[in-house]
Amino acid sequence: GKILAAQYARENKIPYLGICLGMQIATIEFARNVCGLAGANSTEFNKETEHPVISLQEEQQGIVDMGASMRLGSCASTIYPGTKSYDFYGQTDTIHERHRHRWEFNPSYREQLEKCGLTIASVSQNEGLVEIIEIADHPFFIGAQFHPEFKSKPNQPHPLFSGLIAASLENS
């Protein structure tokens, strides 16, 4: 159901903000239905997938005991000019966001997905891991590998939440 929901939002221009797994689901959906990578998946769900567009980081692939092996805490990322996310963040080049996950966008598929129209809006500064994806010709289709809810406050929502609300109001 999650992949179908992401597809429905993408195809019908409904604002979509995928957080962590939601970003991964959006990537899987895009790979399958836009790039034609039948069976694209996450190795979390199918270790034998033909197209592992979401996978464990290479250095974690041999870890059997998963305890304390997550990517946790704040991480500096470069955000690219010309993206919606760059505008939402106030046109700053560096952002700091908090993480709690193991699986990542597989860099082996980056070029192929970009050729199909997926925009990589942000990557981590140390590892070069994909942090934000977008679809440029969509009113608001953004996936964030991090957790923007960790930096939101009642009177100061995270920029991506503000962007989602604004896009929802404009497209209702």
Q: What does each of the following model-derived ranges do?
A:
Residues 17-22, 28, 80, 121-123, ...:
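Generic beta-strand/beta-sheet core signal
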Residues 75-77, 142:
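A broad, low-specificity signal marking well-ordered, structured residues that form hydrophobic/aromatic
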Residues 91, 98-172:
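Acyltransferase
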Residues 58-61, 81-82, 102, 125-128:
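Residues that form or immediately flank small-molecule/cofactor binding pockets and catalytic motifs
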Residues 39-43, 92-99:
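Short, surface-exposed acidic
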Residues 1-75, 82-84, 154, 161-169:
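Cysteine-nucleophile active-site neighborhood
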Residues 72-75, 96-100:
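Active-site rim elements
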